[in-house]
Structure formats: structure tokens, C-alpha cells
Design a protein with these regions (language model features):
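Short, Lys/Arg- and Gly-enriched loop/turn segments at beta-strand edges
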Residues: 71-82
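N-terminal helix initiation/capping motif
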Residues: 1-45, 51, 116-122
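Short beta-strand-centered aromatic/proline hotspots
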Residues: 36-38, 81-88
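Short coil-to-beta transition motif at edge beta-strands of beta-rich domains
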Residues: 18-24, 54-72
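A structural micro-motif recognizing beta-strand termini
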Residues: 51-55, 102
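Short, conserved beta-turn/loop elements at beta-strand boundaries and strand-helix junctions
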Residues: 45-46, 90-95
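C-terminal output/interaction extensions
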Residues: 2-3, 94-122
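Residue-level preference for beta-strand/loop junctions
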Residues: 17, 32, 60-62, 79, ...
Length: 122
């Protein structure tokens, strides 16, 4: 067996960076109820991992909106970016969730890259 390959390289995962930004998970971007706060643990161009600050319960395949405030990343406008996401996994014990970004909008990609760039320096 050849163990010389990096773990990320061997399973073709996108580069991920660690973050500690507070984010919100919503059912709909405009709906002010049922918002769950979470800590963004890591992010890549394809997806994310978060840990909720309180109780939450989501299912695999659920379509949600992840709202990421941009000021902690040195971006003054817009205030936040809301990205449609799909839940890939949810851990009820750890209150953690991982998912993928559903929107390939070039603006979203630019903001996610900026978040990753700033997070690398933390």
C-alpha cells in the first residue's frame, strides 16, 4: 500500500480551512423564525462543517440556507451572504452538521474563497 498520498488527495476532497465564525442556519433566507446559531468549523469551495450552539435537528438531504456574516473576514459590504445548502450529515450527539453548497453562483464562489483566504491567516 502506498501511504505517501495526502488524505485529502486520496479521496479528492477540496481544500478545507478552519474557521470559528458565528453563522446562522435557516429554513428560508427571508423567514425570521427557526434560525439556529452555529460555529463554522471549516469551509471549502464545495461545503462546510458547523457546530450548533443550541439544540438543532436536521436530516440528510434537507435544503436550508447558511447565512455567513462577512465582517469577521474583512468584507464590509454586503453584511452577510446567504448560501443555499444541502445537509449531507447531522450528528445529534455533537450537534454538528456537514453539507454542500447548492449554488454555483460566481459571487458565492468569490466570497467563499475570500473567507478561506482570511481563515488561513487565523
Amino acid at each position: 500500500l502506498d501511504h505517501s498520498k495526502d488524505k485529502n488527495e486520496s479521496n479528492n476532497r477540496a481544500e478545507r480551512v478552519i474557521s470559528h465564525a458565528l453563522v446562522e442556519m435557516r429554513r428560508l433566507s427571508w423567514w425570521p423564525f427557526g434560525i439556529k446559531s452555529a460555529v463554522l468549523l471549516d469551509v471549502s469551495e464545495n461545503g462546510f462543517k458547523i457546530e450548533f450552539t443550541g439544540k438543532a435537528d436536521y436530516s440528510q438531504g434537507e435544503q436550508l440556507v447558511l447565512s455567513i456574516p462577512l465582517s469577521p473576514f474583512g468584507i464590509s459590504a454586503p453584511r452577510a451572504i446567504s448560501i443555499p445548502v444541502e445537509v449531507v450529515w447531522f450528528d445529534k450527539e455533537k450537534m454538528r452538521c456537514g453539507g454542500i453548497f447548492k449554488n454555483n453562483d460566481p459571487a458565492v464562489v468569490i466570497f467563499v474563497r475570500k473567507i478561506m483566504e482570511v481563515s488561513k491567516g487565523i
